[in-house]
C-alpha cells in the first residue's frame, strides 16, 4: 500500500466542457491533500492560459509520498486527447479519451493508490455516439470494480437522499423495486453511512412508492406487498428505518431534522426537493463501491467552457466531502 491517505484523483470529464476549467480553478487555492488530475496536460495548460490563470503541473509519482497541493499547481496523471479540443464543441474523436481517464482513475482508486475519486461532468451522448455503451459514471465504476449493486446518493450540508432505483423510465420503476433489491440498497446505505460518514446509528427515512404511500392498499399495493415486508426484515437486523411514509409528508422539517438519509423510490421523487434546497451545493456520491467516489451535480455546461464564468461551488463541495469521508474512513 502507498501513503495514499492524502491523495485524491480527479477526472475533469468532457474536455470541451467546464470540467478542465473547474480543475484549474480548484488549483488556485491550497489543499490539505494531493490533487492528482487524470487528463491531458496540454489541454489543462491551454485552458489555463485561456482563463488567464497560473498553473504548474507536476508529474504524478506513485512511489512518492503524497504532498499537500499548493495554490497554482496540480499533479497530473497523463492521458492524451486524440483530437484537438475546441472549448464548447463536442468531438466524438475524444470519447475514448474520456473513458480512458475514468478507467485509469478507477483502477488507481480500486488498488488503494488514491483515497478517493472525484468526477467532473461527462457528456454521455457523445460517448455513446462513439459506439461505447455508457449509461453513466455510477454504472461504469460499478462494472469496473465488479460491484453487483451500488447506490446513488445526493447530499447537501442539510440533506442526504439515496435512490432505490436510478436512471429508469417511470414505467419500469415498480417492477425494479423488489424485497431483494431493497435489502441490498438499504444494507449498503446503512453500512456506508456508518463507515464513510461516521454516523454510528443512522436513521433512514423511507418514502412509499405511491401517493399517500398506497393509502393502505387503495392506491397501489407495492407498499403492502414489497416495501413494508422488506423494511420489517431489515429492522430485525438492527437497521433503524422509519416508513414507508408518503413522500410529500416525509420532506418536511419535522421529519428531516431526524433523518440521516432519506431513501426515495425513484429519481424524480427525491431529487427535486434536494436540488431546490441546495442547488449548486449538492454532491453526487456512489455508495457500495470499494472506494470513495463523489461528483459534481451539474452537466458539462459547454457554453461556459473557457469563459471564466463557470461556478466551481459544486466541485469544491465534492472535494471537501471526499476529504471528510477519507477522514471518517481512517478513524
From Swiss-Prot:
Keywords: Cobalt, Cytoplasm, Magnesium, Metal-binding, NAD, NADP, Oxidoreductase, Pyridoxine biosynthesis, Zinc. Catalyzes the NAD(P)-dependent oxidation of 4-(phosphooxy)-L-threonine (HTP) into 2-amino-3-oxo-4-(phosphooxy)butyric acid which spontaneously decarboxylates to form 3-amino-2-oxopropyl phosphate (AHAP). One of its GO terms (cellular component) is cytoplasm. Its main location: cytoplasm. The lineage of its organism: Bacteria, Pseudomonadati, Pseudomonadota, Gammaproteobacteria, Enterobacterales. InterPro entries: PdxA, PdxA_fam. GO terms for biological process: pyridoxal phosphate biosynthetic process; pyridoxine biosynthetic process. This is 4-hydroxythreonine-4-phosphate dehydrogenase. It comes from the Bacteria. The keyword Iron-sulfur does not apply. It is found in: Cytoplasm. Pfam families: PdxA. Pathway: Cofactor biosynthesis; pyridoxine 5'-phosphate biosynthesis; pyridoxine 5'-phosphate from D-erythrose 4-phosphate: step 4/5. Its EC number is 1.1.1.262. Its cofactor is Zn(2+); Mg(2+); Co(2+). Belongs to the PdxA family.
Amino acid at each position: 500500500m502507498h501513503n495514499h491517505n492524502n491523495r485524491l484523483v480527479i477526472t475533469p470529464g468532457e474536455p470541451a466542457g467546464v470540467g478542465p476549467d473547474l480543475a484549474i480553478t480548484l488549483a488556485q487555492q491550497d489543499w490539505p491533500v494531493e490533487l492528482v488530475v487524470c487528463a491531458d496536460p496540454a489541454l489543462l495548460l491551454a485552458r489555463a492560459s485561456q482563463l488567464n490563470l497560473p498553473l504548474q503541473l507536476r508529474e504524478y509519482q506513485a512511489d512518492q509520498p503524497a504532498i499537500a497541493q499548493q495554490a497554482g499547481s496540480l499533479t497530473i496523471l497523463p492521458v492524451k486527447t486524440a483530437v484537438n479540443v475546441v472549448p464548447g464543441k463536442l468531438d466524438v474523436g475524444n470519447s475514448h479519451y474520456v473513458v480512458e481517464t475514468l478507467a485509469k482513475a478507477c483502477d488507481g482508486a480500486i488498488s488503494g493508490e488514491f483515497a478517493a475519486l472525484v468526477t467532473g461532468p461527462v457528456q454521455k451522448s457523445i460517448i455513446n455516439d462513439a459506439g461505447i455503451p455508457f449509461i453513466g459514471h455510477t454504472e461504469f465504476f460499478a462494472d469496473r470494480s465488479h460491484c453487483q449493486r451500488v447506490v446513488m446518493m445526493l447530499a447537501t450540508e442539510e440533506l442526504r437522499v439515496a435512490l432505490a432505483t436510478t436512471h429508469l423510465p417511470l414505467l419500469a420503476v415498480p417492477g425494479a423495486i423488489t424485497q431483494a433489491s431493497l435489502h441490498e440498497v438499504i444494507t449498503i446505505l446503512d453500512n456506508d453511512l456508518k463507515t464513510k460518514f461516521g454516523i454510528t446509528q443512522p436513521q433512514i427515512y423511507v418514502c412509499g412508492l405511491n401517493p399517500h404511500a398506497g393509502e393502505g392498499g387503495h392506491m397501489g399495493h407495492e407498499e403492502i406487498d414489497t416495501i413494508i415486508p422488506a423494511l420489517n426484515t431489515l429492522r430485525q437486523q438492527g437497521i433503524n428505518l422509519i416508513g414507508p411514509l408518503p413522500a410529500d409528508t416525509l420532506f418536511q422539517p419535522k421529519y428531516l431534522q431526524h433523518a440521516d438519509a432519506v431513501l426515495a423510490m425513484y429519481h424524480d421523487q427525491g431529487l427535486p426537493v434536494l436540488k431546490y434546497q441546495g442547488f449548486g451545493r449538492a454532491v453526487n456520491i456512489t455508495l457500495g463501491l470499494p472506494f470513495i467516489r463523489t461528483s459534481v451535480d451539474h452537466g458539462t455546461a459547454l457554453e461556459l467552457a473557457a469563459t471564466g464564468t463557470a461556478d466551481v461551488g459544486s466541485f469544491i463541495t465534492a472535494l471537501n466531502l471526499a476529504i471528510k469521508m477519507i477522514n471518517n474512513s481512517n478513524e
